[in-house]
Amino acid sequence: MVKTPITDAIAAADTQGRFLSNTELQAVNGRYQRAAASLEAARALTANAQRLIDGAAQAVYQKFPYTTQTSGPNYAADARGKSKCARDIGHYLRIITYSLVAGGTGPLDEYLIAGLNEINDAFELSPSWYIEALKYIKANHGLSGQAANEANTYIDYVINALS
């Protein structure tokens, strides 16, 4: 089961054989109050995913032109390489939407961040490429208000993990 603040609170109370405390109930209530904004953000990111992925890939190519000038399986010098880059950016974005729906970093921790350094090292992928892609997505997702805050929280979480 994916960990979220709600499942963490329940697990802690259950381990101790007690009911949820007022503090834990307030935290759960806060999550429910933010849930609508999180779902709005997840819907918008999903609806605009292809535009965001394409734009993020272009931002990477502009900032790091060698990614399109270097031959090899880990670069975007050809259509196959560009496809892999877009796929990887899409994976990051998809897991961010999962975290928005779950209401916690559990999906990011379990499906993205765990093993990230090993994957990047094994395939010679630069974290700076994905940081640039995520910065593009953050600046261009078109969200505002609480929905933007919710999305940006998870985008920043991944950027920090990559830094």
Curated annotation (Swiss-Prot):
Q: How is it modified after translation?
A: Contains one covalently linked phycocyanobilin chromophore.
The record's annotation in SUPFAM superfamilies points to: Globin-like
Gene Ontology terms describing biological process: photosynthesis
Topology term for the membrane: Peripheral membrane protein
One GO CC annotation: plasma membrane-derived thylakoid membrane
The answer to keyword Transport applying to this record is yes
Keywords, sorted A to Z: Antenna complex, Bile pigment, Chromophore, Electron transport, Membrane, Photosynthesis, Phycobilisome, Thylakoid, Transport
Q: Where does (2R,3E)-phycocyanobilin bind?
A: C85
Protein's cellular compartments: Cellular thylakoid membrane
Family, according to the entry, reads as follows: Belongs to the phycobiliprotein family.
Q: What does this protein do?
A: Light-harvesting photosynthetic bile pigment-protein from the phycobiliprotein complex (phycobilisome, PBS). Phycocyanin is the major phycobiliprotein in the PBS rod.
Subunit description: Heterodimer of an alpha and a beta subunit. Heterodimers further assemble into trimers and the trimers into hexamers.
Under what name is this protein listed?
C-phycocyanin alpha subunit
Species name for this entry? Mastigocladus laminosus (Fischerella sp.)
What gene is this protein translated from? cpcA
